[in-house]
């Protein structure tokens, strides 16, 4: 806890989110913009709000997020992970419910590297018989 803020770091793919929560009216600000403005797609906004809806704290926290790296979906996942960790920092009793929903575990899937002699990670060069 930093002052009256609770903190959580979230990661997904190459995105990293630093999340600060405190008691408030339910405002979510991501990189200085409201969440509805920052995440253009509805799915991104939905992913970000999932841990708050699950715990019933959608209107009870002001959330300040700093996120960088990756794309829109990765950033949404990182913010969700950060909010989850910040909620656990605020009240450890929320951990079982969040863990049951799968929000506490970091999604370890990363992009597979491109191999030499292949066009992509697994896509081989076209074979020519003649």
UniProtKB/Swiss-Prot annotation:
<dbReference type="GO" id="GO:0022627">
    <property type="term" value="C:cytosolic small ribosomal subunit"/>
</dbReference>
<dbReference type="Pfam" id="PF00380">
    <property type="entry name" value="Ribosomal_S9"/>
</dbReference>
<dbReference type="InterPro" id="IPR020568">
    <property type="entry name" value="Ribosomal_Su5_D2-typ_SF"/>
</dbReference>
<dbReference type="GO" id="GO:0003723">
    <property type="term" value="F:RNA binding"/>
</dbReference>
<dbReference type="InterPro" id="IPR014721">
    <property type="entry name" value="Ribsml_uS5_D2-typ_fold_subgr"/>
</dbReference>
<dbReference type="InterPro" id="IPR000754">
    <property type="entry name" value="Ribosomal_uS9"/>
</dbReference>
<dbReference type="GO" id="GO:0003735">
    <property type="term" value="F:structural constituent of ribosome"/>
</dbReference>
<protein>
    <recommendedName>
        <fullName>Small ribosomal subunit protein uS9</fullName>
    </recommendedName>
</protein>
<dbReference type="InterPro" id="IPR020574">
    <property type="entry name" value="Ribosomal_uS9_CS"/>
</dbReference>
<dbReference type="InterPro" id="IPR023035">
    <property type="entry name" value="Ribosomal_uS9_bac/plastid"/>
</dbReference>
<comment type="similarity">
    <text>Belongs to the universal ribosomal protein uS9 family.</text>
</comment>
<keyword id="KW-0687">Ribonucleoprotein</keyword>
<dbReference type="GO" id="GO:0006412">
    <property type="term" value="P:translation"/>
</dbReference>
<keyword id="KW-0689">Ribosomal protein</keyword>
């Amino acid at each position: 806890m930093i002052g009256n803020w609770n903190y959580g770091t979230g990661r997904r793919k190459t995105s990293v989110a630093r999340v600060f929560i405190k008691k408030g009216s339910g405002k979510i600000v991501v990189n200085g913009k409201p969440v509805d403005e920052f995440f253009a797609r509805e799915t991104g906004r939905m992913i970000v709000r999932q841990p708050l809806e699950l715990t019933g704290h959608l209107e009870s926290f002001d959330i300040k997020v700093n996120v960088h790296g990756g794309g829109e979906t990765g950033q949404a996942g990182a913010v969700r992970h950060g909010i989850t960790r910040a909620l656990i920092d605020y009240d450890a009793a929320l951990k079982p419910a969040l863990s049951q929903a799968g929000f506490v575990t970091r999604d370890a899937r990363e992009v597979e590297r491109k191999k030499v002699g292949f066009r992509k990670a697994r896509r081989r060069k076209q074979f020519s018989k003649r």
